[in-house]
Each structure stands twice: as C-alpha cells, then as structure tokens.
Swiss-Prot record:
InterPro entries (UniProt xref): ARFGAP/RecO, DNA_rep/recomb_RecO_N, NA-bd_OB-fold, RecO, RecO_C
Transit peptide among keywords: no
Family: Belongs to the RecO family.
Organism: Chlamydia pneumoniae
GO cellular component terms listed in the entry, alphabetical order: bacterial nucleoid
GO biological process annotation, one example: double-strand break repair
The protein's name in its UniProt record: DNA repair protein RecO
Keyword DNA repair belongs to the record: yes
Purpose: Involved in DNA repair and RecF pathway recombination.
Pfam families named among the record's database cross-references: RecO_C, RecO_N
Length: 252
C-alpha cells in the first residue's frame, strides 16, 4: 500500500552500513520509515533525509513492517538554519524536546504548525537559544502540564510573581521541591508574557530581553523527562546528525 506523508525530519539514524531509519514530525505525530541506501549517494532522495528538512514522502507500507521510502521531495530545506552552528544547536534543542515528549502517530496539528513557524522565524532572532527555549515553554503549555495560576500548586497560597518551579508545578517557599528552581519576579513576568503572547512578533521581541532564563526553561522540561533519560542515546544528537549528513562545517 502506498501512502504519502508530509513532515519535518527530526533525525536519521544509521541502520547497518548504508541504510537509515528516519523520523518525521508530522501533523499526525511522530512517524518513522526505512530508507534503503539512505546513507549513500545511491539514494536519490538522500537530501530529504537530512534533519530540519520539510519534505513530502511517498512510502510503501507492508503490514506491520516499517514503511519504506520510494520517493521524496524537499519542500523547505531551511538552509538559513544550517548555515550557523548557533541556529543548528537551538533548532536541535527544539527537536530533542519533540522526540522526548511526542508519541508515534499521535495527532498534533497545532503543535506541528507551531514548530514549523518557529523554524521559519528562528533565523530572525539574535538570541536563538532563548527563542528555542520559548518553543519548549510553549510545548509545555500545549501539553497542559504547566501551572499558570498565580498560586502554589499545593497549598494555593498567592504567588503573583516570585516562586519556585519544578516540572509543571508552581510552588511557594514552604512547599518547594528539593530540585525546584527559584524564579525571580522578572523571570516569572517573562514566562507569563511568553505564555500569553499571540503573535510571533511578540515572541521575537521577548527573545531580545537581556535575561538569562533559557536554561531554567530547559531544566523545567528536562525535569519532566527524567524517567526517559536512560532511554536516550547521546550519539543521536540531531544537530550533530545535520553536520554529518549535510557536511556543514563547525565555524569554530
């Protein structure tokens, strides 16, 4: 049976000496397929397998076996992202967040649209790491696991701004988790501004703020993924795959 899938390549893992397993993020969720000779020049569609590429893929599906690539077309290679390591690294963090949080063929139309828009807009940001962190915060919001109320998640004491955060929880000093991080008043205001932003122009403007909060956002996300960390393989780092497959040279 022939099927057509449109999506963004999140990773392409080597399979044997020559083949690849490629994972897409699509409006219908994560989708993985087999590409014969995908690591070699014999594959006519090799460029469509490079991470951070939007493509349209024709696949042959045979029962429970992995779908096999029969044709691929590049719709957007996002070349601007692949020209600088800072943009590659930031985009890689968005990719890692999707791989860690999304499920196989779990419909995610709004999240796919959001991710695609972030890929289009991230080259416009002078602070791509913070812009990627904004996407991760939006991902937590999309999943409905981020406490946005002005109160402690446990005792409901009023916490208009300064607080502690751990995983999706917002906590007062009395109920802070031992691994919670302190969120200062200005930082919480920035988090709330990100959550309530409706336009990308607002998000780009927020990313210009001289405030070091990106690492805290990544920590909040990672604290939700602790049980999955042992399953991750550091050799599958998406932006290192890009460097390998597209021959981008590290500028430093």
């Amino acid at each position: 049976m022939q099927i057509c899938v449109t999506g963004v390549v999140l990773r392409s893992r080597p399979l044997g000496k020559n083949h690849t397993l490629t994972t897409l993020f699509t409006p219908e969720g994560l989708f993985t397929f087999f590409a014969k000779q995908g690591q070699t020049l014999q594959c006519d569609y090799r460029e469509t397998l490079v991470p951070i590429s939007l493509g349209k893929y024709t696949l042959h599906r045979n029962g429970s076996r992995l779908p096999k690539l029969t044709h691929g077309d590049i719709l957007n290679a996002f070349e601007a992202i692949k020209q600088t390591y800072a943009l590659l690294e930031a985009s890689g963090k968005m990719i890692q967040a999707l791989l860690a949080s999304q499920w196989k063929e779990k419909p995610s139309h709004k999240l796919f649209s959001l991710f695609l828009n972030f890929l289009h807009r991230i080259p416009e940001s002078s602070n791509p790491e913070f812009f990627a962190a904004i996407f991760v915060l939006k991902l937590l919001q999309y999943e409905g696991i981020l406490d946005l109320t002005p109160a402690c998640s446990l005792c409901k004491a009023s916490l208009p701004y300064a607080c502690y955060r751990y995983q999706g929880h917002k906590l007062c000093k009395k109920h802070q988790h031992k691994q919670a991080i302190s969120i200062e008043k200005e930082e919480e205001q920035i988090l709330q501004a990100i959550i309530h932003a409706k336009q990308f122009s607002e998000l780009l403007a927020i990313a210009e703020f001289p405030i070091a909060i990106a690492e805290k956002i990544f920590y909040l996300f990672d604290s939700l993924q602790e049980e999955k960390k042992s399953e991750r393989n550091s050799s599958e780092d998406p932006y290192h795959e890009i460097l390998r497959l597209s021959k981008v040279v590290h500028p430093y």
